[in-house]
């Protein structure tokens, strides 16, 4: 096949893809994004991976409290000669936002920035597909479906849409990445290979931490200033706004729910399984007697960008590439290559809830009645 023949075939495939809606072929090959390192800037490499902690004490919980007044400077990825004073991990408690894992907040924020760089590049170049990997072996394929009038939009309007679409897509996909980690962990995946981690899946600090992290990242990226410095400032402000408490009240709040939410030997007694499927928001679990008005964490929406609905702009597919993928496909009931977060995550969450014999979203009053 000559170069001209190959070009003609690719053009025909691309045309058919456009006629059918979202892309059904890879044009250009998403692996090409790896040759655009200069354009991906400071986010061309995967961010550092931080070790989370369970929000209670016990064997293998890796529990440690974080000092919200001394979190250091957020660092996406420290170079060999750079000073790194980030306090990367630890649990805090907030009176409006519940328990939070600082490592998970930071990890989800950095994943948002990592995806945003790729989404922005893809949309600016008019690509229909881009792929990336996180810290696990799974591969994420993101298909982009541009509106029919995309090329007819004036440059300024398309530029505004591009920037906002990349930000919101990055938030939502990063949240999916973090949720996927919880799902495969529940099914037995071990990032440390040896230590069992299913006890850490969907603990009541995880989902709120992810939701907060992706929002802070978007806010930091919107400023156009240094990401690490903005993340440091925004994280401090967010924790203060959520009513972060001192270590002694953290201990009291943790003790109040011992036996109801967690057990020192058995681990978590309750799992927070609300991933915002129904209404796009996550209600934190706050401890009675240690709470002000709880504040829901809102996920980015695609249905109103300058008054325009972009709900169908993207689609995510996950190729598990982990042994736990077989069990996950069994739950879904279909032996297919990709997992679709939009349709499959609710099924997988329901399966977890059924195995725990709980409703998908636990109500605090019901929990209190079980104490």
PLM regions: where:
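Divalent metal-coordination and catalytic microenvironments
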Residues: 182, 206, 212
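Bacterial N-terminal signal peptides
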Residues: 11-20
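Bacterial N-terminal signal peptides that target proteins for export
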Residues: 2-11
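A structural signal for well-ordered alpha-helical segments within the folded catalytic domains
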Residues: 174, 210-214
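Bulky hydrophobic segments
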Residues: 22-199, 218-371
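Intrinsic disorder/low-complexity signature
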Residues: 1-2, 98
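Hydrophobic/aromatic-rich structural module bridging two neighboring secondary-structure elements via a short loop
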Residues: 202-203
């Amino acid at each position: 096949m000559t170069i001209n023949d190959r070009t003609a075939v690719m053009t025909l495939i691309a045309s058919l893809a456009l006629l059918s809606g979202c892309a059904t072929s890879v044009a250009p090959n998403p692996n090409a994004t790896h040759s655009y390192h200069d354009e991906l800037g400071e986010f061309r490499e995967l961010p550092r991976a931080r070790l989370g902690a369970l929000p209670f004490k016990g064997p293998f919980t890796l529990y440690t409290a974080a000092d919200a007044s001394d979190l250091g400077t957020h660092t996406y990825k420290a170079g060999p000669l750079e000073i790194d004073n980030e306090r990367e991990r630890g649990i805090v408690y907030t009176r409006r936002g519940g328990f939070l894992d600082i490592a998970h907040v930071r990890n989800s924020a950095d994943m948002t920035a990592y995806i945003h760089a790729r989404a922005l590049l893809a949309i600016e170049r008019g690509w229909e597909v881009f792929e990336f990997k996180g810290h696990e072996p799974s591969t994420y394929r993101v298909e982009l479906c541009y509106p029919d009038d995309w090329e007819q939009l004036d440059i300024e309007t398309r530029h505004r849409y591009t920037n906002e679409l990349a930000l919101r897509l990055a938030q939502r996909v990063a949240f999916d990445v973090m949720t996927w980690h919880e799902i495969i962990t529940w099914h037995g995946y071990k990032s440390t290979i040896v230590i069992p981690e299913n006890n850490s899946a969907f603990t009541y600090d995880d989902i709120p931490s992810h939701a907060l992290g992706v929002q802070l990242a978007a806010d930091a990226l919107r400023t156009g200033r240094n990401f690490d410095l903005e993340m440091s400032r925004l994280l401090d402000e967010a924790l203060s706004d959520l009513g972060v408490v001192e270590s002694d009240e953290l201990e009291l709040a943790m003790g109040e729910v011992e036996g109801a939410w967690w057990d020192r030997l058995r681990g978590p007694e309750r799992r927070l399984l609300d991933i915002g499927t129904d209404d796009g928001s996550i209600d934190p679990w706050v401890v009675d007697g240690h709470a002000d008005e709880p504040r829901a964490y809102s996920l980015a929406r695609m249905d109103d960008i300058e008054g325009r609905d972009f709900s169908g702009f993207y689609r995510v597919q996950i190729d598990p590439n982990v042994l736990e993928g077989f069990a996950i496909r069994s739950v879904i009931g279909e032996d297919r290559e990709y997992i679709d977060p939009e349709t499959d995550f609710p099924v997988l969450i329901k399966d977890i809830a059924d195995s725990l014999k709980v409703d998908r979203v636990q109500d605090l009053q019901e929990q209190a009645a079980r104490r």
